[in-house]
Amino acid sequence: MPRSQRNDNFIDKTFTILADILIRILPTTKREREAFIYYRDGMSAQSEGEYAEALGSYYKAMRLEIDSYDRSYILYNIGLIHTSNGNHAKALEYYFQALERNSFLPQAFNNMAVICHYRGEQAIYQGDLEISEAWFDQAAEYWRRAIALSPDNYAEAQNWLKITGRFSPSHRWESWNNSTRVA
């Protein structure tokens, strides 16, 4: 029995029922349906903290899924699992792969920034300020990209960018602010 049929959560059950209806109604191939089922099972396992099971489902979905956009979300979710497991280098690889297929994933840029920021803090604790600044600069770049894609989100990142002087003057808010000033 697929994992999605074992859900005890009302929201998960509702999502599963709606997804099953959509899969039956929309014109999809058997391969696309199977890929979606594995993806859905991966999300279900991931939400319950069953990361090994989720990874197995995502890898099966990746073997079947041919749509680049859909693959980006599978790769993103694999990155999330590696982030949760503390395997940041592997997480970054998967976030990069997701962004290669779909450059409009602000959450991937945000997660990459969080990892870089964490590495910057670790470098400070190790006494390497030069390396920490490089990590913080990289975090700033990723956060600027996330904010550019989703300006109403990432308030903490926006504040950090402003406080640390890393909020680029070429950023759209700075440009907008300068263009609205009265001479």
Swiss-Prot record:
Pfam families: TPR_1 (PF00515). It is a peripheral membrane protein. GO terms for biological process: photosynthesis. It is found in: Plastid, Chloroplast thylakoid membrane. Belongs to the Ycf3 family. Essential for the assembly of the photosystem I (PSI) complex. May act as a chaperone-like factor to guide the assembly of the PSI subunits. This is Photosystem I assembly protein Ycf3. It comes from Adiantum capillus-veneris (Maidenhair fern).
